[in-house]
Each structure stands twice: as structure tokens, then as C-alpha cells.
Curated annotation (Swiss-Prot):
Involved in the binding of tRNA to the ribosomes. GO terms for biological process: translation. Part of the 30S ribosomal subunit. Belongs to the universal ribosomal protein uS10 family. InterPro entries: Ribosomal_uS10, Ribosomal_uS10_CS, Ribosomal_uS10_dom, Ribosomal_uS10_dom_sf. The keyword Transport does not apply. This is Small ribosomal subunit protein uS10. Keywords: Ribonucleoprotein, Ribosomal protein. The keyword Ribosomal protein applies. GO terms for molecular function: structural constituent of ribosome; tRNA binding.
Length: 103
């Protein structure tokens, strides 16, 4: 691969502990194969709040709120080698982590 290329990896998950473990696994794999790694950089957490009525009929003043937090991390693999790309493609990560890879 050329020297100007970099791989940008964005990770998303609802559980921040699983997300951090996955990010650490990616960084460790990339460093072991000889690539320079920048990150993991924590991105802002999205918080989606849903408000519903507690009662099925009336009592509008009684409501309940639920929230769903989406945690995100960004990892840049600078100067990736073909060995690095192959190792990252074969990496097994948990099911709760969404991965976006841009070359």
C-alpha cells in the first residue's frame, strides 16, 4: 500500500465496555503488524430519550422516560501494510459493535 493511505475505523455500540475492548483489540492487532495507530478517539455520545405515558388511558401528567446511549470511537491506522489489512479483516469482534471502515 502507498504511504499516503490510511484506514479510518469508526466503532459504535450501546455498551461502552465492549466498545473499549474491541477498540483495544484493533489497536493491538494493527501495532503488532507494524502499522502506526492513532486512537481510539472518543467521539460524542448520542443520547436518545423516549417519553411515554405510564397509564394506558388518562393521567397525562404521569410519564416515564427511557434513554438509549450510543457510544462511538474513532481509530486511524496510518501507514497500513498488506499484513495489517489482512489481520484486521480476520479479526473477530463482538456482535454488539458496529464497524465502519473507510480507506
Amino acid at each position: 500500500m502507498s504511504n499516503k493511505q490510511k484506514i479510518r475505523i469508526r466503532l459504535k455500540a450501546f455498551d461502552h465496555q465492549v466498545l473499549d475492548q474491541s477498540a483495544e483489540k484493533i489497536v493491538e492487532t494493527a501495532k503488532r503488524t507494524g502499522a502506526k495507530v492513532s486512537g481510539p478517539v472518543p467521539l460524542p455520545t448520542e443520547k436518545e430519550i423516549i417519553t411515554i405515558l405510564r397509564a394506558p388511558h388518562k393521567y397525562k401528567d404521569s410519564r416515564e422516560q427511557f434513554e438509549m446511549r450510543t457510544h462511538k470511537r474513532l481509530i486511524d491506522v496510518v501507514l497500513p501494510t498488506p499484513k495489517t489489512v489482512d489481520a484486521l479483516m480476520r479479526l473477530d469482534l463482538p456482535a454488539g459493535v458496529d464497524i465502519e471502515i473507510k480507506l
